[in-house]
Every structure is written in structure tokens, then in C-alpha cells.
């Protein structure tokens, strides 16, 4: 319910800002070109802003603390492991953070391969063997090396553009048909209240449907990150890490679309809306070598 409320508030803010932008630029919202410009502006703009803020948002959402200087042997091991794997993957050393949570989890985020972040939970460090922890870290390093954050940003931008554009095209047609009064010189948008209501409802519906697309891409990238981990540290270590995840608590995920966690929440209406494939499918993919080719 909270996510739906935030979605509606966000769209309300977008429409208000959109109106101001159109007033300042002189773009006619009733034209297809104007709608397309707006959809591209806000569809990709929101995604790239989220990407640029992803490290800050992710750290704030889990209360993570970036390690500036290792304070103990555990932090020293973590920093050395990340540094070694980053060199192997051919990326710059990411920032490394730890956050307090009982579940076994980790995530990677950041706008660029050379300005990324890897964060791990205290539950992971306490409950996983060094080999298993290495595999999880390698999974996150692979997300960075594969450019998954930018890939998902572009996908989200395309999806957002489609949702905004199609919603407003249909809303214009509905408002003109249901509330337009050309004899009185009313605008081609028709009744503005009908336009607003229809646009909001359609954005919600299309947004939910479009999330199926983004979730499919997210699951696809998880398989590739598992394969990347297997290449860095060995297939058996990654399989052992995934088997260990089966025993973990419900994971605390970073509150950012561009944060890639190792262990996605399992409760979902359908696998279509899951960010991560089921653990058994990930283990089977590693054993079959499907994504290692």
C-alpha cells in the first residue's frame, strides 16, 4: 500500500512539474510531439536521477557505513577480497560498506563502473564461510562489471516513457470523448478533470504491467551475475552460497531500483513480479552451465 501511495504522489508531482515545464518551454501538451518530449524527459530523467542517487539512497535505506579504514580483521578481509575481485574483473575498486541486519545479503550499486559501491550485511559476515562470502561478493562485482545498473536504468527509462506516453494519449481521447465541448471552444484535451483521472489510473495500471518487463530483465541479470561469480571464484563456491541463502532471514533490501541484491524477497504474487529467480533455478542454471557459455 505504501508503494502505491508513493507511486500516486510521484505521478502527481510529475504532472505538476510537467505543467510548469510546458508553460516555460511553450510545448503544446495536446500535440503528440509535446507528449513524446514530456514522456522522454520524465521517463529517462527519473531513471537517471535514481541512478545518480543510487549509492546515497541505498546506504540511507539500510543504514550502511562505508569503510574508510579497516578497523578489524573482518573489515580488512572484506576490503582485500573486494579489491582482489575488482582487479580480476577489470573494474576500479568500489567503495565498501557494512550494514547491520541479521539476514544474509549484499548489494551493489553506483552510476558508473569506476564509481560503484558494494555493501554486505553483518548477517552475511557472521553466518557464511569465507568461500561462500567470496562468492556473494563476486556476484556483486559481476553486476558492476556487467554494467547492470546502467542497463536497468535504460530499460526503466524506456518503460517509463511508454507508460507516460500511452497513458496520456488514451487520457486525451477519453477526456475529449467524455467531457469535450467543442461548441463552447473547450480545448482539444477535453475535460481536464477526466484527463487527469484517466491518466493517473492508466499510469498505475500500465506501471504495474510494465514492471513485469523490468522484473524479467532483473532476473536475467541475476543469472549472469551468478555466472560471473562462478568464473571469478568457482562454480561450487557460488552454488554453496546460494544453498546457504535458503536458510537466511527475509532479506532487508536496499531501497533503490538500481541496487542489485544477492538475495531477493521470496514472497510475491507471482514469479513474474520477482526481482530474483528462485534459488533452486539459480543453482540449476549454474550446474547446467547455461549462462557460463
Swiss-Prot record:
The keyword Ubl conjugation does not apply. Binds 1 zinc ion per subunit. Pfam families: Peptidase_M48 (PF01435). Its EC number is 3.4.24.-. Zn(2+) binds at residues 139, 143, 222. CDD domains: M48B_HtpX_like. Coiled coil: none annotated. Its cofactor is Zn(2+). Keywords: Cell inner membrane, Cell membrane, Hydrolase, Membrane, Metal-binding, Metalloprotease, Protease, Transmembrane, Transmembrane helix, Zinc. It is found in: Cell inner membrane. GO terms for biological process: proteolysis. The active site is at residue 140. One of its GO terms (molecular function) is zinc ion binding. InterPro entries: HtpX_protease, Pept_M48_protease_HtpX, Peptidase_M48. One of its GO terms (cellular component) is plasma membrane. It is a multi-pass membrane protein. It comes from the Bacteria. NCBIfam families: PRK05457.1 (NF003965). This is Protease HtpX. It comes from Citrobacter koseri (strain ATCC BAA-895 / CDC 4225-83 / SGSC4696). The gene is htpX.
